[in-house]
Amino acid sequence: MDKKRIFIVDDESGFTRLLKLTLEKSGNYEVLEENDGTKAWLKAREFKPDIIFLDIVMPKIDGGDVAQQIRSDPLLAKVTIIFLTAIVSRTETTHDIGGFPFLAKPVSLDAITRCITEHLAA
């Protein structure tokens, strides 16, 4: 079975490192992390992920702009993007952040793995 590729873009390096190590430990995923949103699009092109977890609020460029770059790239246009954010409540809908699914921070590992499973099964 091929490992699914997960790309985590978040300026909180401790969070991305922990998530990467935990997901890779399962043996099911190959994980790439990036803490600089300005590098995310090019890294995504190289890595060709199945799912991108993308923080909305980052220095230099926000997740919404990164998502637009990814969506406008024919190579990446169909990749699942899931926003990670602390700026919305758990009761808001995905339409409140541009129609993308999201997980509200702080997010549990269980919520991340459930989200991965659901989106890879779709």
Range-by-range predicted roles:
Residues D10, D55:
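Active-site residues of response regulator receiver
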Residues S13-L32:
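Two-component/phosphorelay signaling modules centered on CheY-like receiver
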Residues E34-T38:
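Conserved Asp/Asn-Gly motif in the active-site loop of CheY-like receiver
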Residues F47-F53:
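Active-site beta3 strand of CheY-like receiver
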Residues M58:
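Receiver (REC) domain active-site loop signature in two-component systems and cognate sites
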Residues I82-L84:
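Hydrophobic/aromatic residues positioned on beta-strands within the core alpha/beta folds
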Residues V107-E118:
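C-terminal output helix
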